[in-house]
Amino acid sequence: MTQPQVYAKLVSMYIFDKYGIQLKFKEMFSRGKDCILSEEKFNLIKECSDFIDILDKRIKCFDGNLTEEIYVKTLNAELKRFGHWDNGTFIANNPKQILGVVVDHMSLVKATTGRTKKDEMDAISRSSVILRNTTKIMSPIHVAQFNRSAGSDERLKQAMQDPTSNDFKDSGSLYEDSQVVLALHSPHKFKLSTYKKYDIKTLEQCFIAIFLLKSRFGTSDIFVPMGFYGDCSHYIEIPKPDEIYDYEKYKDPYWILDKEDNINKSDDNLIDQTSKFVL
């Protein structure tokens, strides 16, 4: 995505969290039929100017072809803003600061002379490990695509749609080098009507399964059922299937606002809460 698109996604998240209003990506850019931005919602975006200023200070986007050479050169240049090297050791200006580096996504990495696309992906993964371990403040996040064999007819017949480590496309090193691996799976795209007792026929693309495939910090092989709401760029954990009596309710994100209205936030630390996974 381009920087304006990234900002639009983040602003849509902010608007929903603060005002409880969904502002579509297309509407924000007045793209498509019946997607003209109204004056009311334009004023709403202007009220987000302070938030956008924060994005300007904290986010830097790089477009164009990506190779390992470009990746390392760019990150080393950026690191100079946050510290310096001393005899091979990186001294951070603020050791508590974390720099998130997102590559979206790895399948768009370009092959170079003498290297295949897989070689470049492996090299970027290897360099990310080095930067992560030597700087102590850099956290590379690599977005990758599953191998298409994950959707093979044979796997569907055997009810083996869940993601595994074998599904990562082009680069096994990416999985091996990662400390944490999250996988997203859409049962609707596989034309499933039910999935782990959830009514996918009703939820359709609003249901996304997130799997913690790997974690060097604790338990892995964890499944989290999520509601995906693209108009406000939110993933929100939904209840267990035996706790859902109206699936239509979970086709938009307003159910979480209704729930928050019933929470006494001043007593939040005094009672047991069911944790929710929200992106």
Say what each PLM segment does.
Residues T2-K24:
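P-loop NTPase switch/communication element
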Residues F16-E27, K33, K46-D53, E69-V101, ...:
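C-terminal regions of RecA-like/P-loop NTPase motor modules
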Residues E40, L44-F62:
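A short helix-to-beta-strand connector/capping loop
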Residues K60-F62, I141, L182, I210:
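Hydrophobic/aromatic beta-strand patches that form the interior of the parallel beta-sheet core
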Residues K60-Y71:
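Functional beta-strand-loop-alpha-helix junction segments that form "active/interaction loops"
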Residues I91-I130:
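Helical hairpin unit composed of two closely spaced alpha helices linked by a short loop
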Residues V102, M138-Q145:
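Structural recognition of the conserved hydrophobic beta-strand(s) that form the central parallel beta-sheet
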Residues L108, Q145-A150:
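Signature of the SF2 helicase/ATPase Hel1-core->accessory helical subdomain module
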